[in-house]
Amino acid sequence: MGSVMSLSCSKRKATSQDVECSSESRKRRKISSENDEEECCRLIPSLPDELSIQILARLPRICYSSVRLVSRRWRSAVSTSEVYSLRKELGRTEEWLYVLTKGHEDKLLWYALDPVSTKWQRLPPMPVVVYEEESRKSLSGLWNMITPSFNVGAIVRSFLGRRDSSEQMPFCGCAIGAVDGGLYVIGGLSRSKTVSCVWRFDPILNSWSEVSSMLASRAYSKTGVLNKKLYVVGGVDRGRGGLSPLQSAEVYDPSTDAWSEVPSMPFSKAQVLPNAFLADLLKPIATGMTCYNGRLCVPQSLYSWPFFVDVGGEVYDPETNLWVEMPSGMGEGWPARQAGTKLSVVVDGELYAFDPSSSMENGKIKVYDQKEDTWKVVIGEVPVYDLTDSESPYLLAGFHGKLHFITRDPNHNVTVLRADVPNIPVSSSSSSSSSVSIPHLKTNAPNKSDTVTWKLIATKDFGAAELVSCQVIDI
């Protein structure tokens, strides 16, 4: 009897142990399964995501297009601000050049250049949005006051009821700006009507989105950035009598997605014309805008197609919220127009401008000397090969602390050249020295002399597309 009881107890004990072992095994399998799932959900297996993000932030931006193809998690990781904020903390931001071109049927296309890898990327196309056209009005009041690049025939065709590419694209006559890591396309014409819409390209998301519209509709305006805010001045609007110039200005704050008014440009020189006839004939317009020494510098002209009369310019100080007349040497000496505009850029605090030659085969680069209130030549000959009647046969840009010139080469490829000038002049805006080196190139081709070296950064075949504008974004 005792042996039977002992055997029964042993069986119960064994059964209990088996149950416990089975339970422990299930727990281990569950934990292992959870660990496997956690491992699979990580960006990089065997590494915590915090470390993986550190690795991704150190990759060159040009690699991100491939990173997005790895998995949804990787695509999500490089499409958030976390990686880019970390890049900024690590000092790993990169300056890219964004070039706007106009192709077949006036279609606008954007391309981004990584100047380090010299690789180009095409941006997603801008949204196709058609805005309602105002009721048609008489052509008798229409006067052509905008630049020669403005397609007068397109406006006439739109009034006559003929279809034109601008009817399908509201970005004809748009202004371009870049602030806070975003690329902005501002205003323009849609079916001959000026619009106030603003579109933003986000390089992080690689997509376009519409942001708050301007306070006023305008086309062919000028833009500049001060204190992380985007300023828009001038341009034209369509009133009862046709297209009329604007003196108004406004500013966009990307942190609040809101526009605010800025005092209008006085155009003081236009107020002193000798008689009413000239005042009605010559229309004041802003022919450019550059942010220099913390202020907006706006060269101006009086315009009556096809003539321009330069009248200096005005300067806006955001601290005083006032416009003042531009120094005479700065305004009167601002180098010649390019299709009704004045081409300039600020690099390391120095204001440069391109002065095209009358032969259209070369030109000069000048720098503004604030102390002497004059423009001085720093590059005596700049290669220009695009002899076509395009809107912008050449562009200026500043990145990596250097001046860059964008034009077409003899094979009609878009070419980005860097000007290396050892003895770069320094104006009183950044140093007490006022010494100036005046180099001179002997040929039109990218060449090297004792004082300047033209270095080819990148080239690309855009076909028959014309250059329109360019911006630099650092993220």
UniProtKB/Swiss-Prot annotation:
Keywords: Kelch repeat, Repeat
Domain (F-box): residue spans on this chain: 41-87
Keyword check for Repeat: yes
PROSITE patterns: FBOX
Kelch repeats: 94-140, 182-228, 229-279, 306-350, 352-401
SUPFAM superfamilies: F-box domain, Kelch motif
Disulphide-bridged cysteine pairs: none
Domain of life: Eukaryota
Coiled coil: none
Region listing for Disordered, in residue ranges: 1-28
Name of the protein described by the UniProt record: F-box/kelch-repeat protein At1g22040
Organism: Arabidopsis thaliana
